[in-house]
């Protein structure tokens, strides 16, 4: 029986975490996209549907980025890959999540969720930083950190 070190166990956990998060967030994006295309048009204005679909698109792009991060995790500089994966998740929560909240506010006809748009750009910054860290992780030859 092969003994697994704590370090490789931790790396496997991170690798698996990014892949499972990416797969789950991708599935959720497909479901939300279907809802936006078929059900949402009946309850909110067209520009709100477009904002919602933008959130869905960016969620899907970054779910795929999480899958990529998990798949390349063992072959790149892991500290930067870890940071990239976390930034992608933060970006999905802030960017896509805020667009979903804005849509919910319009559907419920409440102004209390209108301020959610303030955090949307922060999610965009997290996405950009995530891609830059993924680039750095791929460029650096060392696998362990």
Please provide the spans of the model-predicted regions:
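Polytopic transmembrane helical bundles with strong interfacial aromatic enrichment
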Residues: 2-145
